[in-house]
Structure formats: C-alpha cells, structure tokens
Amino acid sequence: MTVKRVESAMIVSCPHCHIRNRVQSERLNDEASCGSCGRPLFAGAPTALSDANFADVLAASRRPVVADFWAAWCGPCRGFAPVFAQAAARHPEYLFAKIDTDANPQISQQQSIRSIPTLVAFRQGQALDRISGALSAGQLEDWLAGVLR
C-alpha cells in the first residue's frame, strides 16, 4: 500500500485491491476501509511509506509502527518480505510500514539505516528499538513481544 499526503488528507492505495483512497489525516487511527473493496486500509498488510509522508504517519499514528527498511536488489529483504506481511496480517494492533531505502534516501539517512533489512519499532513517533537482518517468523514475533508489549 502506498500513502501520499494531499493537504490535510493522505492518498492511500488499498493493499488488497490497489485502488487509491483519500483519507483525512485525523482518520489515520480510525478503522478506515477501502471505498472499493471495503477491506481495512491500515490493517492486514504493510503500508509503503516515503520521505514525503513518513513523519506525518509516525506523528498521527496512535498504534505502534513497525518499519521495515529494505531495497529491491537485496536478497535477504526479498526473503523477509513474506514474513513481514504475515506478521502484519496477524497483528492489526500495529501499523506495519515498508520503506524502500533506494527510493527514500532522506528518511533512511535520518534513521541512520546502515544495513538492510532493518526493522525499527516506533511508539508515539519515537524509535524504541531496531534490529537488522532477515528474521524468521519466530524471531520477529519474539522481537515484537519484547519491544511493543
């Protein structure tokens, strides 16, 4: 799913049907659903964030944000992607986000991303912890439990 900020709204591509939806910034924490397929916009699948909207989403989200910094050329990143997507489906209480480090160098630099994949957990806009490397499903669950619960 891709999120793009437009004035006080964000354009969000549905992670299920890929139709673009306009969501008011103040509704980021509501159970916003796709106008086309009716499925949740912010639960069940990772949300693609960019340099343009990363800070806005972190500031507006009342849910903890789990960010995966990755790149398309990175083999371990590609291998970890299904594990991350499955975790997003299991944990609607968190906002799972993906940031392509090649397409978004500014936020990658601000977050001091030195290796990929790197996961960073945020609560109320503040980084709580980070871990680098492709994790198994069990390792990811253990890390989430230790950091966010």
Residue ranges of model-derived segments:
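Short linker/helix segments within small regulatory modules
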Residues: 23-32
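Cys/His-rich microdomains that often coordinate metals
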Residues: 21, 41, 81
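Short pre-active-site segment immediately N-terminal to redox-active cysteine/selenocysteine motifs
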Residues: 62-65, 69-73, 115
